[in-house]
Amino acid sequence: MKIFFIRHGETTGDVENRYGGDYNDHLSEKGKQQSLNLSRNLSSKGIEIIYSSPLIRAQETSITLSTQLQCEIITIPNLKERNQYGILTGMNKDEAKQKYPNEVELLKDRLNTVEKAESYEDFSKRLADAFDEIVDNSKYVAIAIVAHGGPLRVLFRDILKWGEISDLGDCAYVELEKIDKKFKLIHSEGFNRNFQIPS
């Protein structure tokens, strides 16, 4: 099985310098173009189905891919981004720093939990459950999973246990191949990885 794990395109919240997480914003015009470019790049990969986060930015990215690839979208609630920012969600970052300086400081460590936010442990577990459910039950040879930066980091750090990724760009993606119960990295685009893939 081939698995394409994709991050959505640039959002209006990115442009407005807002805290994202599970803030439900749309793709920006640039994000729409990024999604279109990605769909063209993946058009020859034989992707048969798209599993998507329910958040609007992932859905809009998925719809662009689906139109180009001519395949169905299945929405998986547990693929949504972590509510990492709690009471800061959707706020302009400069305004948040003025109003909630202590909460902004907490964000420097992913294991900290801001008021009304989802803990990292809960987030990692639900992502692992969603990934296992999709990969174990899908009958397709090539699938796409459209989600967010947080899930892509959890994939490498916690699910595959390969290590950290950085400089994660819009519409970044990784192509994996599952052989028996092992995963092999075929290709990645839009981020740096600070580790060697185990053989």
Task: Say what each PLM segment does.
Residues 3, 139-149:
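Generic beta-sheet signal
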Residues 7-61, 115-127:
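Loop-to-helix element that buttresses phosphate recognition and phosphoryl-transfer chemistry
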Residues 39-100, 104:
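Phosphate-coordination/substrate-recognition cap region in phosphate-metabolizing enzymes
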Residues 44-46, 134-141:
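Glycine-rich phosphate-binding loop signature in dinucleotide/nucleotide-binding domains
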Residues 101-122:
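Short glycine/proline- and acidic residue-enriched helix-loop micro-motifs
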Residues 149-153, 172:
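GST superfamily/GST-like fold recognition
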Residues 162-184:
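Domain-level recognition of soluble alpha/beta enzyme cores
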Residues 186-197:
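Short, solvent-exposed aromatic-acidic interface loops
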